[in-house]
Amino acid sequence: MRQSGASQPLLINMYLPDPVGDGLFKDGKNPSWGPLSPAVQKGSGQIQLWQFLLELLADRANAGCIAWEGGHGEFKLTDPDEVARRWGERKSKPNMNYDKLSRALRYYYDKNIMSKVHGKRYAYRFDFQGLAQACQPPPAHAHAAAAAAAAAAAAQDGALYKLPAGLAPLPFPGLSKLNLMAASAGVAPAGFSYWPGPGPAATAAAATAALYPSPSLQPPPGPFGAVAAASHLGGHYH
């Protein structure tokens, strides 16, 4: 014998806009559960299929296409084509039919939200306990852990794939020798590395300074270097 919607668990009131239809399930609402967000209020396209079905079931005027039957969350699509048409209208999908709608309903089987009533055509049953668990928001510590993991991943990605600001790859292979010479002089190497340091010109100058620490020991350029050196040494004997 078909039972009225009022005999269904009062848990349904969690998932329905307030007020709905003729006010079914209004009394006895669990205060720890809130109503649907404004985005899924009655008439909105931002609504899931299970919410849409509960919305239809809450209004006795829809008994011609869907109605509670048998208790314990069981309901029947008395006119499955009409239910599919209304669902397609709500979601702006004019090609919606019962075959597509039934495939969408099967998605809820693995989620423990709904099941098919065996031996009855177009009959389904809501699992309100599973539905309540599926709708529970994750705990606060889960949000914090997810944020920390995202920050760590972003930091690791930056360390592996990004060069520090102001550094550039080596312009030519010979500069690596200058980097080694500069390192022996206590100058941080530059170029293709993660160590901040002077540019290539400064590095070359530092390497030259390491080889010739005193300006007086710098060799003059060109072939006159030997003559200049001889005259410089000869000055000490006068």
From Swiss-Prot:
DNA-binding interval(s): 47-127
Site annotation Breakpoint for insertion to form EWS-FEV fusion protein: residues: 18-19
Keyword Cell wall biogenesis/degradation applies: no
Annotated segments matching region May mediate active transcriptional repression: 129-238
Primary localization class, coarse: nucleus
Keyword Lipoprotein among UniProt keywords: no
Subcellular localization, as worded in the UniProt entry: Nucleus
Biological process (GO), any one: regulation of transcription by RNA polymerase II
Tissue specificity: In brain, exclusively expressed in the major serotonergic neurons of the dorsal and median raphe nuclei located in the midbrain and pons. Also detected in prostate and small intestine.
Gene Ontology molecular-function annotations: DNA-binding transcription activator activity, RNA polymerase II-specific; DNA-binding transcription factor activity, RNA polymerase II-specific; RNA polymerase II cis-regulatory region sequence-specific DNA binding; sequence-specific double-stranded DNA binding
Keywords: Chromosomal rearrangement, Developmental protein, Differentiation, DNA-binding, Neurogenesis, Nucleus, Transcription, Transcription regulation
Superkingdom of this protein's organism: Eukaryota
Entry's transmembrane regions: none
Pfam families per UniProt: Ets
GO cellular component terms, semicolon-separated: chromatin; nuclear speck; nucleus
InterPro entries referenced in this protein's UniProt entry, alphabetically: Ets_dom (IPR000418), ETS_fam (IPR046328), WH-like_DNA-bd_sf (IPR036388), WH_DNA-bd_sf (IPR036390)
Disease: Sudden infant death syndrome: SIDS is the sudden death of an infant younger than 1 year that remains unexplained after a thorough case investigation, including performance of a complete autopsy, examination of the death scene, and review of clinical history. Pathophysiologic mechanisms for SIDS may include respiratory dysfunction, cardiac dysrhythmias, cardiorespiratory instability, and inborn errors of metabolism, but definitive pathogenic mechanisms precipitating an infant sudden death remain elusive.
Assigned protein family: Belongs to the ETS family.
Role of this protein: Functions as a transcriptional regulator. According to PubMed:12761502, it functions as a transcriptional repressor. Functions in the differentiation and the maintenance of the central serotonergic neurons. May play a role in cell growth.
Protein name: Protein FEV
Record organism: Homo sapiens (Human)
Lineage: Eukaryota, Metazoa, Chordata, Craniata, Vertebrata
